[in-house]
Design a protein with these regions (language model features):
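Mg2+-dependent prenyl diphosphate-binding active-site environment of isoprenoid biosynthetic enzymes
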Residues: 1-126, 132-176, 186-196
Length: 200
C-alpha cells in the first residue's frame, strides 16, 4: 500500500518532505564527490527537477485540475507539460546527474536530458494505458481509476490506439537521443524498452 494508506496523510507528507531534504543533504556531502563544483551542479539540477519548475509544480497543476477543475478542458499539451513536470523531471534528473558525475560534454549532457524527457513521457503513457486496459491482478493495483475519477489523460484524450502510437514514437525518440553513445548506452535502451513493455 501507499504510505498514506498504511499510515495517514500527514505522515506521508512529512515523510516526503524529509526524503526530499535528505536528497539535498546526500548530494552536498563530500563523500558524494570530492569536487565542490560537481556537488553544486548536482544540487542545482535537483532543485530544478524537484521544485516549482519540476515535481512540485507538476503536482500543483495536477491538484488544480483534480480539485478546482482548472483547466476545464485540458489539452494534450497541458497534460504533457503536467506529466513532464510531475513524473518526468526526476527521471530527467537521474539521466542528467550521470552526465554531471561523468564530466560529459554539453552535447552529451543535452542528449541524456532528451533521453530522460522521452523516458518520462513514455513511463506516463504506459502507466495510463495500464490503467485503461490492464487487469488489477496483473498490474498489481486497482485499474480504471482515471476514468472513474473523470481524470484527463493522453489516453482519454486521444484514445488507446493513438496513445499506443505515441508511446512507440516516444520510445523511438528516446533511442534516437542515445545515438552519440553507441553500444555504451544499451542499458538505457533496455530501460526504455522495459518502461514501454511493462505489464505492472
Amino acid at each position: 500500500p501507499t504510505v498514506w494508506k498504511a499510515f495517514d496523510e500527514w505522515t506521508a507528507i512529512l515523510a516526503g518532505d524529509a526524503l526530499l531534504t535528505l536528497a539535498f543533504d546526500v548530494l552536498a556531502r563530500e563523500t558524494t564527490h570530492r569536487d565542490p563544483a560537481i556537488r553544486i551542479a548536482l544540487v542545482q539540477a535537483m532543485a530544478r527537477a524537484s521544485g516549482a519548475a519540476g515535481m512540485v509544480g507538476g503536482q500543483a497543476l495536477d491538484l488544480m485540475a483534480d480539485k478546482l477543475g482548472d483547466p476545464r478542458t485540458p489539452t494534450a499539451d497541458h497534460i504533457r507539460r503536467l506529466q513532464a513536470m510531475k513524473t518526468g523531471a526526476l527521471l530527467v534528473y537521474a539521466c542528467e546527474a550521470g552526465a554531471i558525475l561523468g564530466h560529459a560534454p554539453e552535447a552529451e549532457r543535452k542528449a541524456l536530458v532528451e533521453f530522460g524527457t522521452a523516458l518520462g513521457l513514455a513511463f506516463q503513457i504506459a502507466d495510463d494505458l495500464l490503467d485503461a486496459e490492464g487487469d488489477a491482478a496483473t498490474v498489481g493495483k486497482a485499474v480504471a481509476k482515471d476514468a472513474a475519477a473523470g481524470k484527463a489523460t493522453l489516453v482519454s484524450l486521444m484514445g488507446i490506439p493513438a496513445a499506443r502510437q505515441m508511446l512507440a514514437e516516444t520510445e523511438a525518440r528516446a533511442n534516437a537521443a542515445l545515438a552519440p553513445f553507441s553500444t555504451k548506452a544499451d542499458i538505457l535502451r533496455a530501460a526504455a524498452r522495459f518502461v514501454v513493455a511493462r505489464k505492472s
